[in-house]
Every structure is written in structure tokens, then in C-alpha cells.
């Protein structure tokens, strides 16, 4: 019994530390990934959508190549024609990361099953296109 009491803090510490390296995942069902992970997925995956959830004027000022624009404020208000396949991988970003998290949560509630949120374009190191 005494050995078990001495081992308990050690075992609990190991459990806590082992979860530190796990990929971030929201209780609401989407994954949070890093910019580097997003860039790798864009390079390696074939069937994905890059979703920019900023306002149209922000999107026009600069967006990731291939991204489609569905403003966060519109998600959940109507059917999203641009996202017909609810099982398709959707990589979500905004300006700083706040709206993309909100959008990812809404998409999960709408039944989308493969959502990866990677923050904001402010931290994006890859190519950015603008519509001048």
C-alpha cells in the first residue's frame, strides 16, 4: 500500500507530461495545427479545401493561394455551397486565429468531420495572393 502511495505522484506526473506532446484537439471536434503542419498538409494531401473566414475585403487584400472565402459571420446562417462534402479535409484560417477557431467550432456543429484550424494569415510564411 505504501509503495502504491509513493508511485501515485510519479504515475500522475508521467500521464500529465505524456499528453503535452499530443496534437492539440478541441473538445468540440476540430484539430488545431501549426502553420508548418498546415503547409505540409497542403503539399502532401490531395483532397482538401483551404477556407479563409475573414471578410471579403480582407480576403481581397491577401489570401493563401487556392483559398476560398466564406466569412465567419455567414457560417451557420445558410447552406455553404462551397463546402458540399462534410467529410472533406478543411483547413481553416483567418487574420489572427480568433475567427478561425469560432468558424471551426461552427463547422463541427454543422456536421463537418475533418476540420483543421491553423490560426491567422499574420503568421503565414508562404505565398500570399492579392486581388488588386
Task: List each language-model region with its residue ranges.
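Rhodanese-like catalytic fold shared by cysteine-dependent sulfurtransferases
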Residues: 2-9, 18-36, 41, 48, ...
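Residue-level signal for mature regions of secreted extracellular proteins and peptides
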Residues: 13-14
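Mature N-terminal segment immediately following signal peptide/propeptide cleavage
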Residues: 54
Amino acid at each position: 500500500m505504501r509503495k502504491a502511495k509513493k508511485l501515485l505522484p510519479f504515475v500522475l506526473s508521467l500521464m500529465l507530461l505524456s499528453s503535452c506532446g499530443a496534437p492539440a484537439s478541441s473538445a468540440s471536434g476540430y484539430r488545431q495545427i501549426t502553420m508548418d503542419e498546415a503547409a505540409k498538409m497542403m503539399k502532401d494531401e490531395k483532397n482538401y479545401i483551404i477556407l479563409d473566414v475573414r471578410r471579403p475585403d480582407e480576403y481581397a487584400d491577401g489570401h493563401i493561394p487556392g483559398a476560398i472565402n466564406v466569412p465567419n459571420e455567414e457560417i451557420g446562417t445558410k447552406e455553404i455551397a462551397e463546402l458540399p462534402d462534410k467529410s472533406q479535409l478543411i483547413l481553416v484560417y483567418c487574420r489572427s486565429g480568433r475567427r478561425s477557431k469560432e468558424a471551426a467550432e461552427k463547422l463541427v456543429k454543422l456536421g463537418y468531420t475533418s476540420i483543421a484550424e491553423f490560426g491567422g494569415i499574420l503568421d503565414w510564411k508562404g505565398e500570399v495572393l492579392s486581388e488588386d
